[in-house]
Amino acid sequence: IMVDEYQDTNTAQFQLIKLLAGKYKNLCVVGDDDQSIYKFRGANIYNILNFEKEFPNAVTIKLEQNYRSTQNILNAANGVIANNVGRKAKRLWTENEEGEKIAFHQFETGFDEADYVAKDIRSKVREGMYHYGDCAVLYRTNAQSRLFEERFITASIPYKIVGGVNFYSRREIKDLLAYLKTIDNAMDDLAVRRIINVPKRGIGATTLSRVQDYADENGLTFYNALKMAEEIGTIGRASAKIRPFVMLIQSMRSKLPYISVSELLQEIIEETGYVRELEAENTEEAQQRMENIDELISKAVTYEESEEEPTLSGFLEEVALVADIDSVDETQDYVVLMTLHSAKGLEFPQVYLAGMEDGLFPGFGAICAEN
């Protein structure tokens, strides 16, 4: 019985392995406790850490020679991973050359970091040192891609998100931007229709179709037809479900002269219960979506700080410039943006590790966890 990537096995798989190999002990596992990164999927690190206790007659062979990396990279990796508690001692080495030294740069803000990476990539490509496709930017969470996407678009650097979607194409971002568009002028029927049932208000497809018919017959926008729902005889009592949505939008509009875009976003999130629903889900995906929402608020704050007279319309225009550009070059020569989890097993000539901050890389939850 052979098991690969043993550090990623879960408790149920371990029990199955014990049952299958219990009698004859004809078991060979290959794994590396230093590469255990899938706890959120149920992986149990103790399966590999306690292997010799479960199978005391096992022969352990350390595979410490590395064929991919340079010695400088391995020295840095060895120095970092040596701080892990309870790991199986090992030190990687290679017969490859020492290679370039790892460059360390510290920045005041995430924007400065993304700006540096964009300029450095452009410089190296112009000098013929690398192609765009040789470069990768790695980060801890998908929410961190936003700053790099915006800087790359501004600098005309082709890029591709691997293992995810572009920041402004993510569901929660499109939902909140649709709210902002509706509050701004409500002329965008697609935006209004997107959020009419976000969160769920129990307004059925038939009702929405009849509202659209009324709008078409009377030359109205979809939102203005919603405002007149009580006059649409064909929808009956469903108008009572529409009223709270219209009142919410009108209430937000009345606050526009007095609050900033970031404050408006927070009001929308609070009034709709958007984040509360995600918190109740209590999943890894929900956590990522909440991080994306925080990043959108950060984008709004950055916009407000950079403009003398920030407005909701101005913010939406700035976002549209970024969101509407398809930045993947058909030549396939593009910079790759991805999380560390997506990057496992891949290699690139030029790699940028972004956001290496306390509480972010590794995550705050990982630092505080007992195991």
Locate predicted features.
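Structural preference for long, well-ordered alpha-helical segments in enzyme cores
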Residues: 1-5, 9, 13-16, 20, ...
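Accessory N-terminal region flanking or inserted into the helicase ATPase core
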Residues: 1-2, 11-16, 29, 39, ...
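Helicase P-loop NTPase motor core
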Residues: 56-59, 64-158, 181-185, 239, ...
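A short beta-strand-to-loop transition that corresponds to the Sensor-1 phosphate-sensing loop
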Residues: 31-34, 41-45, 65-67, 77-78, ...
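Conserved helicase C-terminal RecA-like lobe
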Residues: 145-157, 170, 177-371
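Short alpha-helix plus adjacent loop in nuclease-associated cores
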Residues: 34-41, 68-69, 161-184, 196
